[in-house]
């Protein structure tokens, strides 16, 4: 088979489609019929220096893909399949992989490094292949340079794949020693130094104990800083990447090194290759991110007794750092204004300047204003654009008091520049800066309004005029209008935008119809601005919003009439459908209540027909937006929505079955909740189908985990809608809730993402319990719930004891305690009295500063008192 595998791998890369397809099918068949033989053949191919490079590289890639996948359920299957292989096969594959590290071909060695790391990622947590790290490190000093390079690369990938708690500290120390020695200037081979520097980047997460040791930390930092001065660009870049990672991982250990780091970052930004300079700027962005997080967590003024101290590195560096960043703003590229994906030193510098402003607040203003004042009127467009970019970058962070006078003085100048500056670059940045002014310094919370009767008309006229400019400028003008409208969100019965409403709407629709509207996200920006203008409008303009309904409906209708379209045209059309459905959703929410409801509902049948047709277009984005619009329509229509259910139900079911496009599934679950609230017990005929599908979704390991919390919430919505009729589902739903509750109560998040997910899961479970209790209240069937009370109280106690719940969970949890007492009364009085929740947790909520938590707790306290006193 060996010869045949070589040929199949070569054929699988053939330009002849028939040959390629046949080879791919044969490889797939081999894999399905004899997995062990298949993997062994691939590893043998990869390790054989006599085989063609192309077949070896593909063998490694196929082998890697047989061990890992992006989708969690698929990854789990592949891991189980590997673990099920007999030990002899696995040992032979491992031996082949380790042998390949000494192959003369760099690409082949690199592929083997990645595959070894994938195997380690599966086996080390299972306490298998314990000798791997020792065998990689055993004679690293005696190895030829190319093998040393491959070994270091393998160690780097291994650290990326494996969790730090899986590797013993003794092995971690040895890995770091080998890596740091490989980085040392004494190492003569450039490839080895580069591999070592990249490996350190991946191994930093393992170095906690080493960074706690002063001598070891000093040594690592010295070697990294020396590597930033290497003659090789790639090594310098990789060394700065290490510093960026150290800034976020070991911020609190950096004080001793900051002066040296400032000097080397400044030198790199001013003199080095752009790829290196970008990383040097990124170091300061990371420092700012850390300090912003610390200061936000401790409410602005940092308290000295906190876990992570704030060292104010950014504030101390201001006199040197700000001039350095301002210099970068002058290094624009000629066409960056036309390239949406552009990223260069000027953009990185501006982004970092914005983070500095957020980290230090008012202190940045005197450091930046002289630069702005000097350059804002210069003949060279670069200087004008840099000054404008600097101004826009510091608008978030400093207080309104500090900025107000400056912004008031600059506003007229900015409006003139947007109209008259000859440079597209300058106009682009000016429109963006105006958007930032309206985002951060305009709104009901600002004492002295920037926009007043005197300048409102000029601002709107200039923005509307700029919507006819080049697509990139027009897109930013739409963005500025978006924030202008948003600032009037809580304006009351009368809005300063009312006199201009019709003109604004007309102009935005005209922009959306421009022939070049698909450039620079222009069409999307126009509809986003239109939505915000509608959302923040007042009753004064409701007639005009109503007139918009048939216009948008006709646009949506036209997208559904298209004849045969090319792939590109179809994609643009689907995007437009999504935007139009999103626009209709905002209009429904605006007009779907009195006094406009009755007039608006005349369009409901036509609108529903259009949304159902959108489902036929098979575009996930449009599908999501149409589904959300239907949710809004259900809320507006209330019980009358029942007439749409016979036709809509099949699409609802399709959405719940859509595991692939899980966002569609998540949105559909939310819409089930909307429909339940609208129809109440009229949803009953559809509940068997909906509950069956929701239970299937929960049992599936193919569905993205983020959809599962809203499914639990949806149980609550259904129970609340159908009341005691939910009894036919509780025997299936309650055990599922119980097992999910046990899992979430004790899965304290290993990281922020896990904590967030755990809280989301707990909230979903609690919302389900809340809906079920409220749905069964005053029913003869409440006794069905009594056996679950001990478990629910235990769940509440355990999540309280974990001390990691967020405020949303806190409010829902105390609400469930009240619902349980309210619905089950004296049946559970004794149990409640024994729980931690009814004492410590309740008292904590009663003294909460969040009035919604406090109100929920007061209600729960009354319900508990009633349950105990009966």
UniProtKB/Swiss-Prot annotation:
Family matches, as InterPro entries: ARM-like (IPR011989), ARM-type_fold (IPR016024), Importin-beta_N (IPR001494), Importin_beta (IPR040122)
Recorded GO MF terms: small GTPase binding
PROSITE patterns per UniProt: IMPORTIN_B_NT
Primary location class: cytoplasm
Keyword Transport: yes
Reported consequences of knocking out the gene: Delayed development and flowering, reduced length of leaves, stems and siliques, increased sensitivity to abscisic acid (ABA) and increased drought tolerance.
A Pfam family it matches: HEAT_EZ
SUPFAM superfamilies attached to this UniProt entry: ARM repeat
HEAT repeat coordinates: 4-33, 35-67, 87-126, 132-161, 172-204, 214-249, 255-304, 313-361, 365-395, 403-440, 456-492, 498-535, 542-588, 596-637, 642-679, 684-722, 730-776, 826-868
Record-linked SMART domains: IBN_N
Entry keyword annotation includes Phosphoprotein: no
Lineage top rank: taxon: Eukaryota
Any single GO CC term annotated in Swiss-Prot or TrEMBL for this entry: nucleus
Expressed in which tissues: Expressed in roots, cotyledons, leaves, stems, petals, stamen, stigma, siliques, embryos and guard cells.
Keywords assigned by UniProt, alphabetized: Acetylation, Cytoplasm, Nucleus, Protein transport, Repeat, Stress response, Transport
PANTHER family: IMPORTIN BETA
Function: Acts as a negative effector of drought tolerance. Involved in the regulation of stomatal closure and in the abscisic acid (ABA)-mediated pathway that lead to drought tolerance. Does not directly mediate nuclear import of ABI1 and ABI2 which are key regulators of the ABA signaling pathway. May be involved in nuclear translocation of other type 2C protein phosphatases that mediate ABA signaling.
Stated family: Belongs to the importin beta family. Importin beta-1 subfamily.
Protein name in UniProt: Importin subunit beta-1
Source organism of this protein record: Arabidopsis thaliana
């Amino acid at each position: 088979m060996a010869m045949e595998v070589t040929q199949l791998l070569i054929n699988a890369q053939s330009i002849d489609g028939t040959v390629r397809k046949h080879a791919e099918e044969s490889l797939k068949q081999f894999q399905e019929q004899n997995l062990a033989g298949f993997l062994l053949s691939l590893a043998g191919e990869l390790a054989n220096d006599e085989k063609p490079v192309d077949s070896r590289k593909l063998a490694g890639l196929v082998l890697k893909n047989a061990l890992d996948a992006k989708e969690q359920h698929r990854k789990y299957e592949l891991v189980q399949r590997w673990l099920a292989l007999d030990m002899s096969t696995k040992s032979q594959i491992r031996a082949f992989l380790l042998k390949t590290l000494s192959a003369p071909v760099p690409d082949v060695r690199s592929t083997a490094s990645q595959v070894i790391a994938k195997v380690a990622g599966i086996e080390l947590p299972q306490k298998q292949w314990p000798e791997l790290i020792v065998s990689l490190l055993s004679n690293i000093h005696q190895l030829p340079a190319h093998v040393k390079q491959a070994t270091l690369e393998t160690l780097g990938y291994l650290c990326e794949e494996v969790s730090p708690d899986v590797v013993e500290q003794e092995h971690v120390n040895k890995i770091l020693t080998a890596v740091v020695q490989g980085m040392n200037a004494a190492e003569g081979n450039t490839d080895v130094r580069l591999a070592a520097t990249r490996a350190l980047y991946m191994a930093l997460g393992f170095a906690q104990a080493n960074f706690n040791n002063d001598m070891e930390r000093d040594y690592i930092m010295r070697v990294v800083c020396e590597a930033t001065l290497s003659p090789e660009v790639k090594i310098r870049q990789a060394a700065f990447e290490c510093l960026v990672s150290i800034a976020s991982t070991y911020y609190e250990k950096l004080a001793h090194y900051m002066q040296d780091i400032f000097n080397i970052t400044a030198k790199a930004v001013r003199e080095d290759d752009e790829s290196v300079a970008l990383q040097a700027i990124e170091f300061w962005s990371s420092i700012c991110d850390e300090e912003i997080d610390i200061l936000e967590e401790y409410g602005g003024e940092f308290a000295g007794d906190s876990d992570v101290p704030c060292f104010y590195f950014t504030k101390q560096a201001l006199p040197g750092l700000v001039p350095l960043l301002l210099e970068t703003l002058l290094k624009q590229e000629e066409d960056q204004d036309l390239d949406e994906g552009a990223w260069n030193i000027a953009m990185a510098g501006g982004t970092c300047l914005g983070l500095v402003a957020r980290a230090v607040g008012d202190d940045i203003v005197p450091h930046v204003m002289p630069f702005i004042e000097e350059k804002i009127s210069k003949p060279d467009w670069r200087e004008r654009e840099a000054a404008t970019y600097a101004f826009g970058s510091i608008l978030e962070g400093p207080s309104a008091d500090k900025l107000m006078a400056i912004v008031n003085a600059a506003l007229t100048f900015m409006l003139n520049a947007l109209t008259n500056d000859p440079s597209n670059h300058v106009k682009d940045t000016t429109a963006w800066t105006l958007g930032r002014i309206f985002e951060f310094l305009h709104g009901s919370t600002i004492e002295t309004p920037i926009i007043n009767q005197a300048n409102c008309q000029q601002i709107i006229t200039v923005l509307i005029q700029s919507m006819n400019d080049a697509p990139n400028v027009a897109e930013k003008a739409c963005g500025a209008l978006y924030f202008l409208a948003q600032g009037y969100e809580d304006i009351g019965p009368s809005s300063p935008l009312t006199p201009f409403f019709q003109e604004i709407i007309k102009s935005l629709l005209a922009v959306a119809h421009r022939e070049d509207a698909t450039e620079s996200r222009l069409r999307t920006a126009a509809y986003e601005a239109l939505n915000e203008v509608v959302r923040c409008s007042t009753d004064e303009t409701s007639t005009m919003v109503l007139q918009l309904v048939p216009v948008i409906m006709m646009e949506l209708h036209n997208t559904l009439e298209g004849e045969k379209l090319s792939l590109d045209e179809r994609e643009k059309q689907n995007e437009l459908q999504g935007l139009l459905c999103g626009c209709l959703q905002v209009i429904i929410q605006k007009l779907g209540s009195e006094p406009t409801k009755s007039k608006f509902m005349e369009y409901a049948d036509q609108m529903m027909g259009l949304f159902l047709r959108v489902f036929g277009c098979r575009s996930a984005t449009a599908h999501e937006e149409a589904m959300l619009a239907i949710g809004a329509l259900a809320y507006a229509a209330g019980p009358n929505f029942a007439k749409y259910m016979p036709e809509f139900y099949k699409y609802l079911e399709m959405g719940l079955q859509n595991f692939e496009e899980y966002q569609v599934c998540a949105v559909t679950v939310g819409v089930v909740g909307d429909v339940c609230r609208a129809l109440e017990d009229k949803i009953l005929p559809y509940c068997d189908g909906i509950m069956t599908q929701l239970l299937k979704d929960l049992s599936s390991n193919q569905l993205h985990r983020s959809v599962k919390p809203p499914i639990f919430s949806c149980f609550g919505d259904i129970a609340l809608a159908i009341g005691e009729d939910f009894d036919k589902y509780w025997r299936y739903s309650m055990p599922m809730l119980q097992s999910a509750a046990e899992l979430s109560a004790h899965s304290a998040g290993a990281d922020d993402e896990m904590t967030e997910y755990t809280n989301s899961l707990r909230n979903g479970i609690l919302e389900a319990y809340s809906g079920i209790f409220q749905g069964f209240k005053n029913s003869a069937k409440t006794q069905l719930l009594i056996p679950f009370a001990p478990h629910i109280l235990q769940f509440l106690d355990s999540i309280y004891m974990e001390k990691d719940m967020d405020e949303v969970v806190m409010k829902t949890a105390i609400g469930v305690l009240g619902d349980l007492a309210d619905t089950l009364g004296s049946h559970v009085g004794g149990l409640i009295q024994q729980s931690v929740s009814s004492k410590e947790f309740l008292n904590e909520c009663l003294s909460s500063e969040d009035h919604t938590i406090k109100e929920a707790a007061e209600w729960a306290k009354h319900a508990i008192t009633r349950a105990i006193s009966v």
